[in-house]
Amino acid sequence: SLGGFLKGVGKVLAGVGKVVADQFGNLLEAGQ
């Protein structure tokens, strides 16, 4: 179903966003 598909996409985007945020935080800490 479309709802299930969108939920799956949301999960993937949330996971990617978390990884990117973690990496960005590491870069900021390294830059200080």
Curated annotation (Swiss-Prot):
Subcellular localization is given as: Secreted
CC per GO annotation: extracellular region
Alphabetical GO biological process terms: defense response
Q: What is its main location?
A: secreted
Reported tissue expression: Expressed by the skin glands.
Glutamine amide carried by residues:
Q32
List UniProt keywords, sorted A-Z: Amidation, Amphibian defense peptide, Antimicrobial, Secreted
Specify the superkingdom: Eukaryota
- What family does this chain come from, according to its entry? Belongs to the frog skin active peptide (FSAP) family. Dermatoxin subfamily.
Give a short account of what the protein does.
Antimicrobial peptide.
| Protein name according to UniProt | Dermatoxin-J3
Please tell me the species this chain comes from: Phasmahyla jandaia (Jandaia leaf frog)
